[in-house]
Amino acid sequence: MTGIFCIFMWYLLLILYMGQIKGVFGTYEPITYKTGCSLWGIFFIISGISIIRATWYPSQRQLTCAMLENILCMILAIISMILTIVELSTFKSVSYRNYGQAKLGRQISRVLLSFYPLEVSMALTYSIFGCVGLCRKKEDARTADTEEVEDAF
């Protein structure tokens, strides 16, 4: 859900910044918009899909894939958080016509900044439970092997 929200917010920023008029001071193009940080929500959607697949068809490969995607999502969310903080801490003056759009864009960045820790915590939680699931699978496999050996004797 947070991935879809981030993508919609990026689309809103796209519409907002595409409508800027070149003024004396130029247009406001923040670093998060140029890098498409909110568009990285696609990785969160893919990660969620892999988690659902891992719960429906549990295997070591599915759990490992879901865990690796969650780790990637954590890294991307932390990078997005850092870029957003850098964007909000620096502000160049823009022309009077674009000031309202720049101000609204900064408010959207603040909203997204509040969602990045949520994304990190969700990905961390799923990664922890993925590790627990992988360890449990390995223990179950070892237990099954020892039971087969004991039954043979």
Swiss-Prot record:
GO cellular component: plasma membrane
Keywords for the protein's UniProt record, in alphabetical order: Membrane, Receptor, Transmembrane, Transmembrane helix
A single BP term in Gene Ontology: cell surface receptor signaling pathway
Topological category with respect to the lipid bilayer: Multi-pass membrane protein
Domain of life: Eukaryota
Main location: membrane
Transmembrane segments: 1-21, 36-56, 71-91, 111-131
Compartment list: Membrane
Function as written in the Swiss-Prot or TrEMBL entry: May be involved in signal transduction as a component of a multimeric receptor complex.
Protein family: Belongs to the MS4A family.
Protein name as it appears in the record: Membrane-spanning 4-domains subfamily A member 13
Naturally occurring in which organism (per UniProt): Bos taurus
